[in-house]
Amino acid sequence: MRINTGAPIPEGADAVVQVEDTELLKKSDDGKEELEIKIKQIPKAGQDIRPIGSDIEQGSVILHQGSVIGPAEIGLLATVGATKIKVVTKPIISLLSTGNELQDPKDASPLKSGFIRDSNKSTLKALLDDQGFSVNDCGIATDDLEDLNDKLSQALQSGDIVVTTGGVSMGDRDLLRQVLVQKFDATIHFGRVNMKPGKPTTFATLTWSSKKKLVLGLPGNPVSATVTSHLYVLPCARAMSGYDRPFGAIVKAKIPMDLNLDSR
């Protein structure tokens, strides 16, 4: 008797022979029935049969809290008929670049003297888009207290996490921490970290429109901004999204040369 893959086993049968291991010897005159089949290999009892519940046992946990829902997980949920589940809403992330020297990459005019194109925002947006987060482009703020205050206000209004680049070092025009404390009554949890690149990375929290907001100030150097976005921004966004492993996998590696650490 022919059956399809995954179909129930006919009563009395105790083995399945794959069609590749058979040879059709005789059909009915109308070609609709297979009258005689040659089995090339002797089957064993239980061959190619899976017991009921062998894929997913009744009462088993198919997804743990903190699991990321991707294509495989959606298929698994569909298999068990789970059409509605509770999920954690991902945070909206506002990106704001700072610096008098920045020119928007969308500006098609020739690069102005003394300016550089703002590559950080494009890099961070692509990274966060790739991880499935909603991102708001809040433009570029100049090194001016009022302009930075206005742009930060807009970023806080539209996002749960505000990520800035530039303005966090020790220069006269590095104003982010000053504005956060004086204008937004923010709590600075750290303003320097023992790492390089990324030493001036800043983390602050504040309340805006009765909601708690997170601010991550990254260095303006593109390499530093990229490194710190992986070490701080992504884990922060994942933790707020309910990931059980916000930091991802840790891989040990051995470098083939000596590494001279910065004494600072």
Predicted feature residues:
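Short glycine-rich anion-binding loops that position phosphate/pyrophosphate groups of nucleotides
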Residues: A7-P8, N100-E101, G167-R173, G220
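Hydrophobic alpha-helical scaffolding
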Residues: I49, S67, G114-D118, C138-A141, ...
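Flexible glycine/proline-rich
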Residues: I56, V179, K183-R264
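N-terminal small/polar loop signature for handling phosphorylated ligands or for N-terminal nucleophile
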Residues: S122-D185
